[in-house]
Regions:
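Conserved donor NDP-sugar-binding/catalytic core segment of glycosyltransferases
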Residues: 122-160
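A conserved acidic beta->alpha catalytic loop
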Residues: 68-77, 122
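C-terminal catalytic/acceptor-binding lobe
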Residues: 3-19, 31, 201, 205-286
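N-proximal low-complexity "stem/linker" segments adjacent to membrane-targeting elements
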Residues: 1-54
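A recurrent flexible, glycine/aromatic-enriched loop bordering the glycosyltransferase active site
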Residues: 99, 152, 166-187, 206
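Short, acidic, metal-binding catalytic loop of nucleotide-sugar glycosyltransferases
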Residues: 51-63
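Short beta-strand-to-loop acidic/aromatic patch adjacent to the donor-nucleotide binding site
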Residues: 112-122
Length: 286
């Protein structure tokens, strides 16, 4: 019998067998329908990876999907050192930016609830912030999104115009929230059509895309909630050293202004309707 044209080396066969045996011995099993999936957008922030993994692991045995968007600082290699569980995944892309790569990751997830985390976030070392969010989703089938960074009691996406809710307090319904963390019910996301890809070209910032989905949710029978989680630091604090600020500050500002106009054009004539929906939802809270 002829030798195969592309033989697998014997040492590779042994290493594969050893790896399979180690996985079986670990006791970890693949979850077909995990309760929650964390999705991390990663872009050249290798120094924060260990801390993110430690914090997310402390939150429970959940799915972890990392979207490394073309980092050049060794981030993919560092992620691979950590992603060793059956429900861990690493998606590689080439600077598509958050809208497109997280959209693909949400469709990849097998949990009903996903939680979007950014690569500059500092994850709490106790899990109550995750459990609380999951309880809110269980209590309200119409709840599509929960944000933990800033919430807004106006449809205006600009914090300079609509003063944000930014700090501790009980859960409440709000007009819109932004990422970090950003919990979303996957079926609601899909029924709403997902992120609006017109909010950025591939590789460009997509400022306000997270807020727009919230406003779209309210006008389609869903609800949006806010409960502060200090992933960006203490209430009222944000270092403003995220990727778009560091790498493309001018494009970021142009994008913010353009997308703010988009939101006004779409929702200005429905502002009173959204106001009433938010107010009514809050009166129904236990």
């Amino acid at each position: 019998m002829d030798a195969p044209p592309n033989p697998v080396e014997p040492d590779v066969i042994e290493r594969v067998r050893a790896a399979k045996a180690a996985r079986r011995a670990s006791g970890l099993v693949y979850a077909e329908r995990p309760r929650l999936a964390f999705i991390v957008h990663s872009f050249n922030r290798v120094s924060n990876i260990d801390q993110i993994v430690d914090g997310l692991r402390a939150a429970g045995t959940h799915e972890l999907i990392v979207c490394d968007d073309g980092s050049v600082d060794g981030s993919p290699e560092r992620w691979l050192e950590h992603l060793d569980r059956p429900n861990d995944f690493l998606i590689h892309s080439n600077d598509l930016h958050e809208i497109r790569i997280t959209d693909r990751a949400i469709s990849w997830a097998r949990s009903e609830i996903v939680c979007l985390v950014q690569d500059d976030d500092v994850i709490p070392d106790e899990p109550s912030w995750v459990q609380t969010a999951l309880e809110h989703f269980a209590d309200d089938p119409a709840l599509a999104v929960i944000g933990g960074f800033m919430g807004f009691d106006s449809f205006d996406p600009d914090p300079a115009v609509a003063m944000p809710l930014w700090g501790h307090g009980e859960f409440r319904y709000v007009h819109h929230v932004n990422i970090g963390p950003y919990f979303v019910r996957r079926t609601s996301y899909e029924q709403l059509g997902g992120w609006d890809h017109t909010f950025s070209a591939p590789g460009d910032p997509g400022i306000c895309f997270d807020s727009e989905l919230c406003l779209r949710a309210w006008t389609n029978g869903y609800r949006v909630g806010y409960s502060f989680v200090p992933l960006k630091g203490a209430a009222g604090h944000y270092a403003m050293d995220g990727g778009t600020v560091l790498f493309t500050p001018d494009e970021r500002e142009r994008n913010r202004l353009a997308n703010s106009r988009r939101i006004f054009e779409r929702y200005a004539d429905r502002a009173a309707e959204i106001d009433a929906l938010v107010e009514h939802a809050n009166t129904q809270r236990p």
